[in-house]
Amino acid sequence: MKELSLNGAVVQTYPLTAAQRIHFYTVSACRREELLNIATGFYIEFADVDFNTLRACIRDGYEKFESMRLRFTKDEDGNLVQYLVPTEDREIKLVDFSHWREEDAHEEMKRWSRIPLHMDGSPMSEIVMIRLPGNFNGLYMKVHHMTMDSTAIMSFYSYVLNLYCYKKFENIEAPKLPKSYLAQLKLDLKYEDNSPALERDRKFWLEQLEAPEPIYTPFSPRNRLLELREQTGNPNLRACYGTGDIEADIKVYELEDAPSKALIAFSKEYRIPVASILLLGLRTVFSHFSGNEKDVSVKNAVARRGTLLESQSGGTRIHFWPLRTVIEPETSFLDALKIVQAKENALLRHANYDPIRYMGETAAHYGCPQGTGYECTTLTYQPVSAASLKGRQLPDMNFKSMWYSNGVAMQLIYVTVMHRPTDNGFSFHFEYEKNSVSLDEIEKLYYYLCRAIFRGIEDPNRTIGEILDWM
């Protein structure tokens, strides 16, 4: 931690955390800063929104959420550091799209989403109040991923919306105040300073490298590992490149209401997290596309929001970890879920370790070519639904939420599963490199993912081998 003089003012600066370094490493590799934009919209069917009050609530949100006032700059040694500004005084404008076609309005906001936020002391967010056709009104928000992740964004929306309701309606409780980002940041930096917890986590991850080398399994019938083996003349290669042309888009599939409810009911009945079911579904598909390979790895996004301070302090906390399982074909679906869940729990206990450091340790240990890896995709499951933002406050109003593509991706395909605001069903978002991955590949991935999951849910005693045979 160092003091830095900026524009005549002395500010306290802090190093980047491991979670922030993941994003900085990625954007440094592709040199497209818009990669780290997260752009979302939240709109309520309510014609009489008081935008002056809403603007005041947004300003209050900026004041209360410290990570919304983060800035980045380089210190005298050339290292990127972070610091807080005391206030956020920028204009919060209102844009009226009410006379546009709604799809054109969303296209315009998608264009905004591809304008980068620069890490040069500039603001790391942009919020615009929006009027949409059909009396839908709300917010468009673009934030930098090194300041906020999806959990933090949902918390910010919740705070602003609940504060607005508290000010405008009767019998509404004031929102709970968020925790301090700086307090959690100092704990994270203390962990990284050769703490005993860090040593325990390092020991765990180095033990994972004692296993034989993993193998890349594909997300579609096109096996890119076999293609790379042929190109390099190395039939023993087990790792593959995970990116191509980085221009990206998002394809969304909506799981119908009945199967969504069946998945949630199964999760509750057997006390298996939805994330574990999704992970098993994905690894089963990857096994299918690789000739029923038993050894499958999926990269899992771990939120690291276990404590009250972690869950309510904003910021970006996601670490990405390989979830590797070896599942025999005679294993039942339910037992396979328990294997995945146990592996997930082990990762969670040691998720604070630096993923970038572990990537380097993995590459050095197995000798895989630079830029290659063993996981064909990353899964993010967002258990907090947009419906939870307004359930107690505005139960009788329709609303919609949007996730706008920033146009860039550093992975061939990235799977995000979230809950629909209308009925709490599941939306499957496939962010994909559109010049490297075909829509046919995505369609097959979604089709077989649903097939694998619901074959298992229908009869948890079915074996993985039987499910693979039916695929």
Predicted regions mapped to residue ranges:
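Extended, hydrophobic beta-loop-alpha segments that form or line the acyl/peptidyl-thioester binding
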Residues: 65, 69, 154-160, 294-301, ...
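Gly/Ser/Thr-rich phosphate-binding loops and adjoining beta-strand/alpha-helix segments
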Residues: 3-16, 33-53, 119-141, 229-307, ...
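Flexible, non-catalytic linker and terminal segments flanking ANL/adenylate-forming cores
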Residues: 1-15, 19, 206, 222-224, ...
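Short amphipathic alpha-helices and their capping loops
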Residues: 1-31, 56-100, 180-248
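Active-site-proximal acidic secondary-structure segment that organizes catalysis
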Residues: 8-15, 19, 95, 125-183, ...
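A short, small/polar-residue-rich loop/turn motif at beta-strand boundaries
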Residues: 2-11, 15, 47-63, 79-122, ...
